[in-house]
């Protein structure tokens, strides 16, 4: 039981630090008045997700083409 206390305490401590940093940054954004809209957030994440999905799809297609043609 004693061996689990230190890592668990460390995880809780790091989680609290990251949470407080997020809250500080959120508060700074609200003070500036330059708040990012929900559409901008989704647009940035959507573009990243599309890029990753496109690369993964191309990789899967190239592997399938290789296996079907027997050139692997």
From Swiss-Prot:
It comes from the Eukaryota. Its main location: secreted. It is found in: Secreted. One of its GO terms (cellular component) is extracellular region. It holds the Pfam family FSAP_sig_propep. GO terms for biological process: defense response to fungus; defense response to Gram-negative bacterium; defense response to Gram-positive bacterium; hemolysis in another organism. Residues 23-40 form a propeptide. Expressed by the skin glands. Keywords: Amphibian defense peptide, Antibiotic, Antimicrobial, Cleavage on pair of basic residues, Cytolysis, Disulfide bond, Fungicide, Hemolysis, Secreted, Signal. InterPro entries: Frog_antimicrobial_propeptide. Disulfide bonds join 66-72. Residues 1-22 form the signal peptide. Belongs to the frog skin active peptide (FSAP) family. Brevinin subfamily. Antimicrobial peptide. Active against a variety of Gram-negative and Gram-positive bacterial strains. Active against fungus C.glabrata 090902 but not against C.albicans ATCC 10231. Shows hemolytic activity against human erythrocytes. This is Brevinin-2SN3. It comes from Sylvirana spinulosa (Fine-spined frog).
């Amino acid at each position: 039981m004693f061996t689990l206390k230190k890592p668990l305490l460390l995880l809780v401590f790091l989680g609290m630090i990251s949470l407080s940093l997020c809250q500080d940054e959120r508060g700074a954004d609200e003070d500036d008045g330059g708040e990012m809209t929900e559409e901008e957030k989704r647009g940035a994440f959507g573009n990243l997700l599309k890029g990753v999905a496109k690369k993964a799809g191309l990789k899967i297609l190239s592997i399938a083409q290789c296996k079907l043609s027997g050139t692997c």
